[in-house]
Amino acid sequence: MNVTQAEIGKEYIIKSIETQDEELDAFLFSLGCYSGEVITVISHLRGGFVVAIKDARYTIDKQLAEAIII
């Protein structure tokens, strides 16, 4: 299951990041988005998602959301 399928407001543990793009991996890691970290979907936007990771909120697009396996 990935972030696009997550329920709003529910906490999930990130199981893995599935991408072949090293820049995308590095970007997600810089947000604190890596295996074992808690992620919460705050809302669905047209073409993206607002997620909470640690104590911060981020807007990510569908491509990023699909790469985050929960």
Q: Where on the chain are the PLM-derived regions?
A:
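Short alpha-helix capping/helix-loop boundary micro-motifs
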Residues: 23-27
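Intrinsically disordered, low-complexity, charged/polar segments
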Residues: 2-5, 66
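Short, acidic/hydrophobic/Gly-rich beta-strand patch recurrent on exposed beta strands
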Residues: 14-16, 30-32, 50-53
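C-terminal structural segments of small proteins and small subunits
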Residues: 42-70
